[in-house]
UniProtKB/Swiss-Prot annotation:
GO molecular function: metal ion binding; UDP-3-O-acyl-N-acetylglucosamine deacetylase activity
Protein name, UniProt field: UDP-3-O-acyl-N-acetylglucosamine deacetylase
Active site, UniProt feature: 266
Keyword RNA-binding part of the UniProt annotation: no
Organism, scientific name: Francisella tularensis subsp. holarctica (strain LVS)
The entry's keywords: Hydrolase, Lipid A biosynthesis, Lipid biosynthesis, Lipid metabolism, Metal-binding, Zinc
Length: 286
């Protein structure tokens, strides 16, 4: 029997919001059994708690955003990198206090979160872990993109990207990853978010990527990568999309299945979660 888990002690970080450009402080605290993962907007009066659940997802551009009762003013966004780390460390119960509507982006990957989780430690709790097992395929599509989850006895992720862009097209576009914490830390967690330099002005006009820099993202032009050290992995682009997807799908909690995505992003990932939980015949509790 798998047990629920939380962190052994709290930790705090500061950083900048990727899209808002605002300085953010965040403290992650242990939580009791069956608490789930809860974000607390400590900057609001009274404070607002937003539980991580598919029903809290609100459609957003270029990130995953959760709201309290659908209220855009009571929200927390860009949670996917932290959630990705939580998924791999099997964290079930935790309280995240944040003083802004967006999490700090750190270096654009989940690596710093993995190191903090290793540092504070993970503890088992005296209650069975709750999750679901996929019994039949569930798939969502948009144009030529799709995201699906298939029955599997192991937790597995597969991602394929396709960009008509000379730099990204020159890299490996496909990755398969079976759950393994050490492998995740080594081969996935350091992959950074990326963006196209030519789109930066447009993004800023739409209040996006205001906190983006070469310290927290891979900058891409038609000629190459702007970051002085280049890419961390030859196929960093597809690895980061995998990192994001792991975090997005963990909004649904522990789901045993084989996730398979083609050109999927946050919107399609989130739609897949909704489709899974809407079809009661597609899964069973474990």
């Amino acid at each position: 029997m798998m047990k629920q888990k939380t962190i052994a002690k709290e930790f705090s970080v500061t950083g900048v919001g990727l899209h808002s450009g605002v300085d953010v402080s965040m403290t992650v605290k242990p939580a009791d059994i069956d608490s789930g993962i809860v974000f607390r907007r400590a900057d609001l009066t009274p404070v607002v708690d937003i539980k991580v659940t598919p029903s809290s997802i609100k459609e957003a551009i270029m990130c995953t955003l959760l709201t309290k009762d659908g209220d855009q003013n009571l929200s927390v966004s860009t949670i996917e990198h932290l959630m990705s780390a939580f998924a791999m460390f099997e964290v079930d119960n935790v309280l995240i206090e944040v003083n802004a509507p967006e999490l700090p982006v750190m270096d654009g990957s989940s690596y710093e979160f993995t190191q903090l989780l290793k540092q504070v430690g993970i503890v088992e709790q005296n209650s069975a872990r709750k999750g679901i097992k996929i019994l039949k395929p569930v798939r969502v599509e948009h144009e030529d993109k799709f995201a699906e989850v298939l029955p599997s006895d192991t937790l597995k992720y597969e991602f394929k990207i396709h960009w008509d862009h000379p730099v990204i097209a020159a890299t490996n576009d496909h990755i398969v990853f079976e759950y393994d914490l050490d492998e995740y830390i080594k081969m996935v967690s350091k992959a950074r978010t990326f963006g196209f330099y030519e789109q930066l002005a447009y993004l800023h006009q739409n209040n996006l990527a205001k906190g983006a820099s070469l310290d927290n993202a891979v900058g891409v032009t038609n000629e190459g990568v702007l970051n002085e050290g280049g890419l961390r992995y030859d196929d960093e682009f597809v690895r980061h999309k995998l990192l994001d997807a792991i975090g997005d799908f963990y909004v649904g909690g522990y789901i045993l299945g084989h996730f398979n995505c083609f050109k999927s992003g946050h919107t399609l990932n989130n739609k897949l979660l909704h489709a899974v939980f809407a079809d009661k015949d597609a899964w069973e509790y474990i």
